[in-house]
Amino acid sequence: MGLSRKEQVFLALLGASGVSGLTALILLLVEATSVLLPTDIKFGIVFDAGSSHTSLFLYQWLANKENGTGVVSQALACQVEGPGISSYTSNAAQAGESLQGCLEEALVLIPEAQHRKTPTFLGATAGMRLLSRKNSSQARDIFAAVTQVLGRSPVDFWGAELLAGQAEGAFGWITVNYGLGTLVKYSFTGEWIQPPEEMLVGALDMGGASTQITFVPGGPILDKSTQADFRLYGSDYSVYTHSYLCFGRDQMLSRLLVGLVQSRPAALLRHPCYLSGYQTTLALGPLYESPCVHATPPLSLPQNLTVEGTGNPGACVSAIRELFNFSSCQGQEDCAFDGVYQPPLRGQFYAFSNFYYTFHFLNLTSRQPLSTVNATIWEFCQRPWKLVEASYPGQDRWLRDYCASGLYILTLLHEGYGFSEETWPSLEFRKQAGGVDIGWTLGYMLNLTGMIPADAPAQWRAESYGVWVAKVVFMVLALVAVVGAALVQLFWLQD
């Protein structure tokens, strides 16, 4: 006996619902794949408290990291108004308050929900190193004031501390090579690769109070006190680095002036590094207050000196050489000056900060040969002050010192570090590397991100849009078939 019409329809609907439901289940289980959600962006703030000024740098990186170190980019550079924090010896509280403006500017760029998650650090360099030598109590008061202001700010304040000269040099080296892509590069195949060691670039930094040289030598570093070791992007690095305190631009100028006073004490000081026709009055006392000056003012001199420029580059170089102790390295192969060990130079070098600012003014950043650099600086030093002053309006603050700074840099690089006519082309004078301002701060943040745990990216079950639509359609068909079968069973009268 055959099935009735009602039974045929009921079984057909029931079968359709089963097929549709099974198809939807297969699509749900088979086509689903693991999909990583977009990773969050994290932020970090570093204050560079230098001897002449303080700068804030805001960095950002993805929460997931490449080989244990975050890929960091610069989001903001802000120069704090006023002098360096070491200048606030008579009003320590003002040192902390001076940081507020740049900090508020940085917080505008960070989502409010991440303010408290943003690591913030202040590193003080040679200016505070000198103040700590001169008056440790004043240095502690300034650090306390800075810590109080940043500690109550809506950030994750990690602390304020004195950065060692060796660390300053090493982190500057990291910044240069990160910006140039010589630490890690993103290949055309979509993979992160490590370039060969020969591509690494040395770093030459000069602040107001110290100067640093850092590079990877061709052999072992014999003086381990000049070696810095760290790990980035899954690779280990050992670099030679040394910081020369009191050899920064501002301290060099002060020492140079004191040396001239000591050699010829008189109420009228003729300065060979100042352009001819320049004249000014300087207070004698403050010149001798720096820990870099190891002399006492001659008793016969008045409190104020009249200083007159003579524009004599030969005499200027002779006075600058007196700031170095070259004789301490006689008979030693691996020695720079002042008896400091230095292995042979190797590879390309980036010279930044005051190296760059001075040579940029003198239009010497186009890799000119050493002979051209020397001739250009000497020619500038022999120009009359009135002519130079008229050619560069509004630059009176630094204008008188470019002759001395240029000849000092030339002496330091050529006679101190040992860049010859042949190796001079390996020098590049730069402010940025790969679109990033060069300094120790980015290198520090790159190293710091190695200590910040990477958030594991969230995984979800997901499928393509077409599969999702098909799954919904089959589920709807299954539901319609089940409802239809139920209605047939309940309301269809028997044949």
From Swiss-Prot:
Q: What Gene Ontology terms describe what this protein does at the molecular function level? A: apyrase activity; ATP binding; GDP phosphatase activity; metal ion binding; ribonucleoside triphosphate phosphatase activity; UDP phosphatase activity
Q: Which domain of life is it from?
A: Eukaryota
CDD domains the record matches: ASKHA_NBD_NTPDase8 (cd24113)
- The residue ranges for the Cytoplasmic side of the membrane come to 1-8, 493-495
Keyword list, A-Z: ATP-binding, Calcium, Cell membrane, Disulfide bond, Glycoprotein, Hydrolase, Magnesium, Membrane, Metal-binding, Nucleotide-binding, Transmembrane, Transmembrane helix
| Coiled-coil regions, chain positions | none
Q: Catalytic activity, per the record?
A: a ribonucleoside 5'-triphosphate + 2 H2O = a ribonucleoside 5'-phosphate + 2 phosphate + 2 H(+)
User: What does the UniProt record note about how this protein's activity is regulated?
Assistant: Not inhibited by ARL 67156.
List all annotated glycosylation positions: N67, N304, N363
User: Has the keyword Transmembrane helix been applied to this entry?
Assistant: yes
The reply to whether Chaperone figures as a keyword in the UniProt entry is no
- Annotated TM spans: 9-29, 472-492
Q: Which residues lie on this side of the membrane: Extracellular?
A: 30-471
Tell me which GO cellular component terms the UniProt record holds. plasma membrane
Gene Ontology biological process terms from the UniProt entry = nucleoside diphosphate biosynthetic process; nucleoside diphosphate catabolic process; nucleoside monophosphate biosynthetic process
- Report the membrane topology from the UniProt record: Multi-pass membrane protein
* Record's subcellular location: Cell membrane
Q: According to the record, how does the cofactor bind?
A: Ca(2+) or Mg(2+). Has lower efficiency with Mg(2+).
Q: Name one Pfam family in it.
A: GDA1_CD39
Q: EC number(s) for this protein?
A: 3.6.1.5
Active-site residue list: E168
Biological role: Canalicular ectonucleoside NTPDase responsible for the main hepatic NTPDase activity. Ectonucleoside NTPDases catalyze the hydrolysis of gamma- and beta-phosphate residues of nucleotides, playing a central role in concentration of extracellular nucleotides. Has activity toward ATP, ADP, UTP and UDP, but not toward AMP.
Copy the domain comment: The transmembranous domains are involved in regulation of enzyme activity.
The record's comment on protein family reads: Belongs to the GDA1/CD39 NTPase family.
| Full protein name | Ectonucleoside triphosphate diphosphohydrolase 8
Which species does the entry assign this protein to?
Homo sapiens
